[in-house]
Regions:
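Bacterial N-terminal signal peptides
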Residues: 6-18
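Positively charged n-region of N-terminal signal peptides that target proteins for export
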Residues: 1-4
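Exported/periplasmic ABC-transporter solute-binding proteins
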Residues: 26-64, 68-75, 80-99, 103-271
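Sec/Tat signal peptide C-region and signal peptidase I cleavage site
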Residues: 19-25
Length: 271
């Protein structure tokens, strides 16, 4: 699995290297965390129809790769799964907007399934976790530096320690990307992985969310506070954003995109 992660890192490097030249006028190159790749593709036609700007979605970059590409002038905008690090701010990067989406646990089981939130960390710590009906629960991990680990730790007190212990085991799968994570979850009977509502909806995944304490992580539940846990997605621009990047940020924050974003399990909010 370490070899798989190294190959993904090399692929990201080759993609960034292939993006020759500065961002062209009349188009916006954008990329970022894998969970939003299909979200951006779904938004592109309406954005282009309204602005005349072509939205060119560069896949498979990840948050760090996309942020670096913005700093290098190869992307006009990034959508990052985490806030900026100090070294990225030192390169002139800035957060110019936010998207929010519910985050929860998904499974390949036909469902509906429900877990007590207080029991989840114990399942992650168990050597042989089981679903309530006795079916083996197959947990998939993310790389240690992935932003989803922080979201899980915030969702379940004690999860950070549980994930640290799980990484010592050699029998668990590690998903290098958001797409790998969903692919593995679909293939495994009894899977349990963390994911955003936006990714599951945009990619039309054959996965179902698990209710926590009886509450499903829907967008309505997230917005009314009955389901409190989500993931922030950061719109990252250079110190002087181009007109195309500004147009896309304005598009996301305005009424034209509101309905489509909701269909995809997202809401926009200015920082």
């Amino acid at each position: 699995m370490k070899r798989r992660i190294a190959l993904v890192a090399a692929l990201i490097g080759s993609i960034i290297g292939a993006m020759a030249g500065p961002v062209a006028a009349g188009e916006l190159r954008i990329g970022g965390t894998g969970a939003v790749t299909d979200v951006l593709r779904a938004l592109a036609p309406d954005f282009t129809a309204r602005t005349g700007i072509a939205l060119v979605v560069i896949p498979s970059l990840g948050s760090s790769g996309a942020n670096n590409a913005v700093a290098d002038g190869k992307l006009g905008l990034a959508v990052s799964g985490r806030d900026l690090r100090d070294k990225e701010k030192a390169r002139g990067l800035q957060v110019v907007g936010l998207l929010r989406t519910p985050y929860g646990l998904v499974t390949s089981r036909p469902g509906p399934d429900s877990l007590a939130r207080a029991d989840v960390v114990g399942l992650y710590k168990s050597a042989r976790p089981l679903w309530p009906d006795g079916m083996p629960m197959l947990i998939v991990l993310r790389p240690a530096d992935d932003s989803d680990n922080d979201v899980l730790a915030a969702l379940f007190p004690g999860m950070a320690e549980a994930l640290t212990q799980l990484r010592k085991r050699r029998d668990l799968s590690v998903a290098a990307t958001d797409q790998d994570n969903a692919d593995m979850a679909e293939r495994m009977n009894g899977s349990l992985v963390g994911a955003t509502l936006a990714q599951i909806k945009a990619e039309k995944r054959n996965l179902r969310f698990v209710a926590l304490d009886g509450v499903m992580p829907s967008l309505d539940a997230y917005l009314d506070g009955s389901y409190a846990h989500g993931k922030l997605l950061y719109l990252v621009a250079p110190a002087t954003p181009g007109a195309e990047a500004k147009a896309f940020v304005d598009f996301l924050a305005g009424p034209a995109a509101r309905s489509r974003l909701r269909d995809l399990g997202l809401v926009a909010g200015a920082r």
